[in-house]
C-alpha cells in the first residue's frame, strides 16, 4: 500500500482533475529536468555535451513526456528545411519507463512535427542505438547524406552513424 501511495507509478485508482501523463512542448521551466535526463548520457559519451545555455536557447525544439508533474522523457528536433530534412536528437526515456512504448511515442511525435514542417526525411546521429532505429524503419546513410550545414558541424572523432527515415 505504501508503494502505491508514495510513488508515481503505484497500482490503484486515483481521481484527478487533469490527466497524469502528458506529451507537451518544453518550456524554460523544464530545462533542469531535461538536463537531468541528458547529463548521464553526455557523461558516458552517448550524447554530445550541450550545457544549460544551449538547452535554454533551444528549449522550443524539445518535447517532454511528463507523468504527474515528473518529466521522464524528451526529444529534440532541428529543422533543415532548405533540404527537407529534420534532425531528431536527445530521444531519451528514463530507465524505469523504458519498454513501455514511450520511445515510440516520442519518435512518432518527432515524425509528425517534421512532416508538419514540410520535411520529407528525419535523420539521427547515433553511436550506440543503431538497432533501435533500424527496427523502426531508419536506413543507414552517410555524412554526405546530411544537410550541408550539419555536414560542416559533424564531429568525425565521435564516429556517429547516420540513420535516415523517409517520412510517409
Where are these regions (language model features)?
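C-terminal catalytic "cap/lid" subdomain
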Residues: 1-49, 53-54, 97
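Active-site beta-strand termini and strand-to-loop segments that position acidic
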Residues: 66-68, 165-167
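Conserved beta-strand in the GNAT
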Residues: 64, 70-79, 85-92
Amino acid at each position: 500500500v505504501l508503494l502505491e501511495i508514495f510513488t508515481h507509478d503505484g497500482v490503484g485508482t486515483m481521481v484527478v482533475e487533469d490527466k497524469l501523463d502528458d506529451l507537451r512542448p518544453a518550456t524554460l521551466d523544464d530545462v533542469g529536468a531535461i538536463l537531468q535526463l541528458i547529463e548521464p548520457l553526455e557523461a558516458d559519451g552517448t550524447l554530445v555535451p550541450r550545457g544549460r545555455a544551449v538547452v535554454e536557447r533551444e528549449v522550443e525544439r524539445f518535447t517532454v513526456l511528463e507523468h504527474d508533474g515528473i518529466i521522464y522523457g524528451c526529444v529534440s528536433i532541428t529543422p533543415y528545411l532548405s533540404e527537407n530534412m529534420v534532425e531528431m536528437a536527445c530521444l531519451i526515456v528514463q530507465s524505469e519507463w523504458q519498454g513501455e512504448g514511450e520511445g515510440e511515442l516520442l519518435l512518432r511525435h518527432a515524425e509528425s512535427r517534421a512532416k508538419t514542417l514540410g520535411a520529407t526525411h528525419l535523420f539521427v546521429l547515433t553511436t550506440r542505438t543503431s538497432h533501435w532505429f533500424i527496427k523502426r524503419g531508419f536506413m543507414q546513410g552517410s555524412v554526405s547524406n546530411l544537410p550541408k550545414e550539419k555536414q560542416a558541424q559533424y564531429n568525425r572523432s565521435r564516429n556517429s552513424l547516420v540513420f535516415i527515415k523517409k517520412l510517409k
